[in-house]
């Protein structure tokens, strides 16, 4: 991941590499990154070692930027803007694929009412077994739990073909205004459906509400829009036929939770 800065939106700095593993500087290694800001002074990042197709032990990491410095969740300084990139080894390990032997992929990050980070990601025990997971910083440690199994990949693989994007989950999105809830897409009775899952005990238990039911076409990649501060929350998702990111006939639907 790289970034560039500007003070006027017209002139931009030369790009800088933000994070990089020592000894793994090849251009083909690409950590996946999700970002959220408090809109004031801090930017929060969650990221992986790379693409799960290429990283059988893909892990989930976290760091925060504020006032020219980079920190772990407990406030330990791990880098400076003038001394980039930040190393994976110095960042928080939220989920350790080396310990479990199961690869992961990041999906979303949000901040709770105390400004602490909450992360949604998938654990991928196999190509046909995707698990939605939820991690949040309690102020003292990372609480990391599974939400629910999600099924297999969501692209509709043609008969007789092997699926190239077998780690493409149905998708999960945190409700930014209240990240104790997520929207996700999982396989129900042979079809991908959208559901809202909520916890009232920091992930120890979950309840869910079906947004779509008994669908004839897939419903995938839910997104809960950022910046909406109303009492109700929205979710948008893709529905239709999807074979590949170059071959699809889909539309976007929206649901308002009242």
What are these regions (language model features)?
Residues 1-258:
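Extracellular, repeat-based ectodomains that mediate carbohydrate processing or recognition
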